Structure formats: structure tokens, C-alpha cells
């Protein structure tokens, strides 16, 4: 399957799990979805299936965390066999836990190793192997530092697509959350990168809050990755196909999306899933609408109760004024 990076939803730890992705996919057929970051160690040695997903989630990219080329190649091969549409290497996450495993943003300082990792994966898979990174780390935040990284990883590793989180990462002193908010955004640097590496596919990530903003970035770049906004106000995804991909399909109402989740939820509950693990991703669906607070509160107070099922969502939906027709 060919897919476009024109719009994607960022890999977000503890957020973009398979329930979240199924929900997002009901709103947009075209948006590229990413898994949460999965470490090579979890896939190779962990108990449980870390590569499971729903067929409906395509186009779907697996984000890997690791720095051992052999392990990454092994995981990439498994992922391709399971049907993933893209393999993405995390060179952007700044958390201590990640650095201790020698992957994430600290790898920006080792571009040759990143190139080796990408090359090892490309050797064993046919799907695209991409890199998500930052504009710099700590005091290594010159434009030359970024261009050296991209040059080496693209020329020696064969990477043709980069998603640039337009902030640098502080590897010590800031939490991952602070690293998403405190370092200033520098979109022009990503635009410049695209001009200087016009043969590469370059997407941007960081601080994008609307499709209008995405359209502005798309005048300069190949793709836009939306993170927290797509999670906290997911309904923005409902008009992506029409606004960015030229679809003529009608935009779904919020209530339709809720009702389309019912069969999935019933099937998951029958397999022993816990309702709250699914509905937590839906809390922001009515963001900024009358009744939104009551919707959120009803789900939050009831989804965790033993034996709770669809009636929780049905009752929550009844809190949204009918005359809104949403």
C-alpha cells in the first residue's frame, strides 16, 4: 500500500494505542497513523504481542526505539511480515529512560550509528524506513548540526524521509513533557532544511493546532504531523480527508463516530478488554461544545466500574443537547 505523509498523527507514548488508532481511523481514511514507540527489547524479549493492531488501522507506521542495527533489522522484518506500512526510528524522545537505553534524541549526536541502523533495516524490508528527530540537542543546536545529521543519515543510511520536531531537546534538566513545551519552536529551520534537501521528503511536527496551520506548513514542506491536538481535540481529524486530500465524502458527525465505535467496543469487551481503556481516547470528541463537560464526566465516572458497557457511552451521548445535531 502506498501512503502519504501529508498528514499524520504523532506516535505518543501511553496515548496512541490500538484503541486510539481505531477511533482516529473512523474519522479519516487518509491520515497516516503511528504506533506508540516500541523498543526492540520489548519485541524481541518481551512477553506479549507488541505488534498487534486492527486491520482497519492502515495506513499504519510502527515507531521503533533502539540503536542496535541487528536488533532493529530483526524487528523491522517482523513488522513488515505483520503488514505495517512504514518503519520509523525514534531519534527524538528525550526521556532519561530512553537515553539509558541509548536511543531517542541522544542518537542525534551519533549520526553514523543512526545511518547504520537505517541501512540495516532497509536491507531487510521493502516498506519505507523513516526517521523522526529534533532540530538539535542541548547546545548542539546550530543549523549545521542538523544538516550534518540529515546528510549522513540520508547519504550513508539511505533514509529518504524525515519528520522534524521543530524544537531542540534538552537531554538533562527537562522532563519529556517540558521538552515538548519549553524549547522554542523553529519552523523556518525545517523549511530551510526542505530547501537544502529538496530531494528528501520532510515533514514537520510540534505545536500544530489546526488544519489551517497545517495548510500553511504544507506550502513549505511535504507533510505535517499533529500530536497532542489530535488527541485532545480529535474531531479535527474528521475533515482531514476533505480539506487536505480532496475527498468528497461527507464529514461525519460526532454522534455518528460514537455510534460507529459501538461494534468495536462490544467485540473488545467480549475479549476481556476494559471499557475505560477504550473510552479514555474519546473524551475530547465534543471539545468546546455545549455538553462536553458532562460527556467527559459521565464517561470518567462510569467507564471504570465493573461490568460497564455500551450504556456508559449511550448515556454520555444523551448529555449532548439534541438540537445541536452534532
UniProtKB/Swiss-Prot annotation:
CDD domains (UniProt xref): DUS_like_FMN
UniProt GO MF annotations: flavin adenine dinucleotide binding; FMN binding; tRNA binding; tRNA-dihydrouridine20 synthase activity; tRNA-dihydrouridine20a synthase activity
Catalytic residue list: 93
E.C. number: 1.3.1.-, 1.3.1.91
InterPro entries (alphabetical): Aldolase_TIM, DUS-like_FMN-bd, DUS_fam, DusA, tRNA_hU_synthase_CS
Residues with site note (Interacts with tRNA): 90, 177, 180, 293, 296
Binding-site residues, FMN: 11-13, 63, 132, 165, 205-207, 227-228
Top enzyme category: oxidoreductase
Keyword Cytoplasm assigned: no
Family: Belongs to the Dus family. DusA subfamily.
Protein name: tRNA-dihydrouridine(20/20a) synthase
Organism: Vibrio parahaemolyticus serotype O3:K6 (strain RIMD 2210633)
Amino acid at each position: 500500500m502506498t501512503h502519504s505523509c501529508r498528514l499524520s498523527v504523532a506516535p505518543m507514548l501511553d496515548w496512541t494505542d490500538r484503541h486510539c488508532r481505531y477511533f482516529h481511523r473512523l474519522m479519516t481514511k487518509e491520515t497516516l497513523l503511528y504506533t506508540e514507540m516500541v523498543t526492540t527489547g520489548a519485541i524481541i524479549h518481551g512477553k506479549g504481542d507488541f505488534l498487534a493492531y486492527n486491520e482497519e488501522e492502515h495506513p499504519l507506521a510502527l515507531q521503533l526505539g533502539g540503536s542496535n542495527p541487528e536488533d532493529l533489522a530483526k524487528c523491522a522484518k517482523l513488522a513488515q511480515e505483520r503488514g505495517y506500512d512504514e518503519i520509523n526510528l525514534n531519534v527524538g524522545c528525550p526521556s532519561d529512560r530512553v537515553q539509558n537505553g541509548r536511543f531517542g534524541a541522544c542518537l542525534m549526536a551519533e549520526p553514523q550509528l543512526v545511518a547504520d541502523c537505517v541501512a540495516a533495516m532497509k536491507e531487510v524490508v521493502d516498506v519505507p524506513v523513516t526517521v523522526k528527530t529534533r532540530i538539535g540537542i542541548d547546545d548542539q543546536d546550530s543549523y549545521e548540526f542538523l544538516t550534518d545529521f540529515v546528510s549522513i543519515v540520508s547519504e550513508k543510511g539511505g533514509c529518504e524521509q524525515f519528520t522534524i520536531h521543530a524544537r531542540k531537546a534538552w537531554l538533562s534538566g527537562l522532563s519529556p513533557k517540558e521538552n515538548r513545551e519549553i524549547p522554542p519552536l523553529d519552523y523556518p529551520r525545517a523549511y530551510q532544511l526542505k530547501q537544502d534537501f529538496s530531494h528528501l521528503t520532510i515533514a514537520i511536527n510540534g505545536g500544530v493546532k489546526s488544519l489551517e496551520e497545517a495548510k500553511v506548513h504544507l506550502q513549505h514542506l511535504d507533510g505535517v504531523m499533529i500530536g497532542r491536538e489530535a488527541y485532545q481535540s480529535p474531531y479535527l481529524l474528521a475533515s482531514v480527508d476533505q480539506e487536505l486530500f480532496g475527498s468528497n465524502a461527507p464529514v461525519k458527525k460526532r454522534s455518528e463516530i460514537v455510534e460507529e465505535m459501538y461494534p468495536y467496543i462490544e467485540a473488545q469487551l467480549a475479549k476481556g478488554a476494559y471499557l475505560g481503556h477504550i473510552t479514555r481516547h474519546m473524551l475530547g470528541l465534543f471539545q468546546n461544545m455545549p455538553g462536553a463537560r458532562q460527556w467527559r464526566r459521565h464517561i470518567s465516572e462510569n467507564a471504570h466500574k465493573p461490568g460497564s458497557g455500551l450504556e456508559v457511552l449511550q448515556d454520555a451521548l444523551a448529555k449532548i443537547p439534541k438540537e445541536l445535531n452534532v
